[in-house]
Structures are given as structure tokens and as C-alpha cells.
């Protein structure tokens, strides 16, 4: 092992609250559509928390940044979700599996972190912590080798990536050149028949605004029941919905089986809130879902996303990650399946796009006219912009 790969330091940070940066960063505003507009969600059954997702603490944990440095001074960096809880796990538990280790031994490090955290982990914040470490390792190895991450995981399979955009304003996004738009469903079962009619009116208005052929997807954010999803999808057939996303709780594989049986010709997607390959086994083996959407920053990092994709490929099930910015772009660039990614309209009104991570990095690529050609910059191609944004975890 050379000095270039031997890990000598692990630094973990949360973000200064004043920083205009973070995982899935949303600029400071009196209101932001992602958290302060009416979006059906698992807490919609409680009147106190129905109107705004910010009311029940979505995103309250915040972000973390992991830096891994080798003996020659090369630093790999990545951001992720989980804030202070995830940062504490990395600093006080996972660092022992990194110091002195060869940074190329990514599978070994991943396995040790996962097995050591089984008594309290397996999903959620713990896997988010593993994801951040994993992504920092890939960035580090790419920088040492002088190659982009996509070259380390199979090379470039396509020159260009296209994007759809998640937004409350599909017509504005269509004008920006994105090939499709995904809208958040406003109402769920707790809003009754009036809510069902309002959902159909909402979708019909957006269909009219973008025309009959522009792909329009619907994000249901774990908010529906089996019977409601079946009814809604049937009633919306004339609107030509491109896919229905995350209609049920991640725990309800049997529910997805029932929905797919009821509407086998419609496209159903899910799994941004599923964790590790173990959470995907039944979805894949039973062919319950048409497109799998792991979040690279939540599911276990790039390493675990590649494992899930390999498993899914045996069943001809496409994998198109949820969000994840450049971490998803490098994955998609290396794959031979779908050549598109998700982008989220992070402006307060959702009509324009901004960097996924705000001002956190220099070098974060953005789509132009809904398209992107990834540069060949080493690692993920990004460097921290300003260390004043960081608060190191002791």
C-alpha cells in the first residue's frame, strides 16, 4: 500500500446554520414549495401537520460532510444526510475502520461498517452515515487515480445524460428543456372524496398546461393506501400519467403487489426510502416495481447502489436513483440502462433550478436545456467552496 492510498485522517462536519449549502439544499425563504406547500405525506392524517411538511420536521436532521485524507494529503469529500446523529456515528464508530486502511478497499470498509452497526443500524441514519463515508472513499480513489468516478465503476456508457425535473410548475420546467416533470400529489386518503376530486383537477390542470405528450409523473410520498392508489390511478387514466411514484409505505411490499395486479400496464416506481440491497430483495425478485429509485446518499452509497443495480438487471428492472446530484450522475453515466436522472427545482417557487448542494461545492455540474455531459474531472469533480460553512464534530 502506498502513501497515496493509506488513510491517515477522517474529519466529519455538520453545516453552519447560516451556510447557503447542504444536502438537497433549499435557499432561505419565507416559504419553499418542497416543505411549505400542501403535499400529501405520511403525517397528513394529523390536521396539525397536514398543511406543511416543515411542521413535522422533515429535514430536521440536516446534512453532514465527510473528509477522508490519505498520507500524501489527498482528500476525498462527500456530503450526505443525517446531520449530527450521522456525523457522530462516523466520528466515534466508523472512523476506526478507516484509519490506516487502504482507501481502495471500499467493499471491505463498507462491510465492516454495516456489520459493526447491526445492533442499532440496518436502515435510516446509520445507513446514511455509511453512504457519506462510501461516497467520500470513491471521491478519494478517483482523485488519487486522476480519474472520474464513472471510470472506476465500468467507464462511460453514454456521452450525455438527460433529466426530468421535480417541480410544482411543470410548464416552467418544460420551457427549460427538461424531458418531463414530476409533481407532488396534494391530497391523500384523509382528505376524502373531495380530496380525490381535487387531486384529479390538479393533475388535469397540469396536463392541460404541458400538453398531451409531455411526460408527467406523480410523487405520492408514501401517503396513499392500496385502495386509494388503485382508484386514483384508474380515474386519472385519461391524463396519461407517465408513472406513479412511492404511493405506499416502504414496508408494504404486499401492497405494491396488489396495486401492480390491479393496474399491470401502468408504471409504478418506488424505493427512495428503502435501505441497502436487503431492502430491495423482494421488490426485485417478485417484480413488484417497474423502476427502482434508491437514493445514493441514503441507500448505502455508490457501492450499495451498484449491488442493487446488478441484482435488478437480472430481472430487467431499471434503476434510476432519487435525486443525489452528481453521485447519481456518475452512476447513470456508467450504466447501460436508462440514460436519465432526476433534478429537483430547488428555487423557492420551483420554477428554476439551482445547484443541488447550494454553495457547498465548487464544480457541481448542472443540466443545460435538460441535458448534461459529465466532465472528466477526478473523483466526483467537486471541492469544498468555503470551510467557514463547516462545523467540525469532535
Residue ranges of model-derived segments:
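Metal-dependent enolase-superfamily TIM-barrel catalytic cores that perform enediolate-based chemistry
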Residues: 154-259, 263
Amino acid at each position: 500500500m502506498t502513501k497515496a492510498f493509506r488513510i491517515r485522517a477522517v474529519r466529519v462536519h455538520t453545516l453552519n446554520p447560516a451556510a447557503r449549502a447542504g444536502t438537497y439544499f433549499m435557499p432561505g425563504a419565507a416559504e419553499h414549495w418542497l416543505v411549505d406547500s400542501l403535499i400529501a405525506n405520511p403525517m397528513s392524517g394529523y390536521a396539525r401537520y397536514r398543511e406543511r411538511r416543515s411542521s413535522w420536521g422533515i429535514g430536521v436532521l440536516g446534512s453532514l460532510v465527510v473528509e477522508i485524507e490519505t498520507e500524501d494529503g489527498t482528500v476525498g469529500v462527500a456530503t450526505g444526510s443525517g446531520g449530527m446523529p450521522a456525523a457522530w456515528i462516523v466520528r466515534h464508530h466508523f472512523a476506526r475502520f478507516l484509519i490506516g486502511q487502504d482507501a481502495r478497499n471500499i467493499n471491505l470498509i463498507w462491510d465492516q461498517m454495516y456489520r459493526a452497526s447491526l445492533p442499532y443500524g440496518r436502515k435510516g441514519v446509520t445507513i446514511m452515515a455509511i453512504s457519506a463515508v462510501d461516497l467520500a472513499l470513491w471521491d478519494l480513489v478517483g482523485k488519487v487515480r486522476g480519474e472520474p468516478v464513472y471510470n472506476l465503476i465500468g467507464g462511460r456508457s453514454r456521452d450525455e445524460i438527460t433529466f426530468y425535473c421535480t417541480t410544482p410548475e411543470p410548464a416552467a420546467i418544460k420551457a427549460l428543456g427538461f424531458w418531463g416533470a414530476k409533481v407532488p400529489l396534494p391530497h391523500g386518503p384523509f382528505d376524502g372524496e373531495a380530496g380525490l376530486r381535487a387531486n384529479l383537477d390538479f393533475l388535469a390542470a397540469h396536463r392541460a398546461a404541458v400538453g398531451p405528450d409531455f411526460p408527467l409523473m406523480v410523487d405520492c410520498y408514501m401517503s396513499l393506501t392500496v385502495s386509494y392508489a388503485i382508484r386514483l390511478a384508474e380515474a386519472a387514466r385519461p391524463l396519461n400519467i407517465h408513472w406513479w411514484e412511492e404511493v405506499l409505505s416502504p414496508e408494504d411490499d404486499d401492497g405494491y403487489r396488489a396495486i401492480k395486479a390491479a393496474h399491470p400496464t401502468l408504471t409504478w416506481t418506488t424505493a427512495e426510502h428503502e435501505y441497502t440491497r436487503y431492502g430491495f430483495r423482494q421488490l426485485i425478485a417478485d417484480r413488484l416495481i417497474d423502476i427502482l429509485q434508491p437514493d445514493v446518499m441514503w441507500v448505502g452509497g455508490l457501492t450499495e447502489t451498484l449491488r442493487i443495480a446488478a441484482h435488478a438487471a437480472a430481472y430487467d428492472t431499471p434503476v434510476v436513483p432519487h435525486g443525489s446530484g452528481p453521485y447519481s450522475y456518475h452512476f447513470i453515466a456508467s450504466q447501460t440502462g436508462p440514460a436519465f436522472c432526476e433534478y429537483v427545482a430547488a428555487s423557492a417557487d420551483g420554477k428554476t433550478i439551482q445547484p443541488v448542494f447550494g454553495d457547498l461545492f465548487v464544480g457541481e455540474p448542472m443540466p443545460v436545456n435538460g441535458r448534461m455531459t459529465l466532465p472528466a474531472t477526478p473523483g466526483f469533480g467537486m471541492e469544498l467552496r468555503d470551510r467557514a460553512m463547516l462545523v467540525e464534530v469532535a
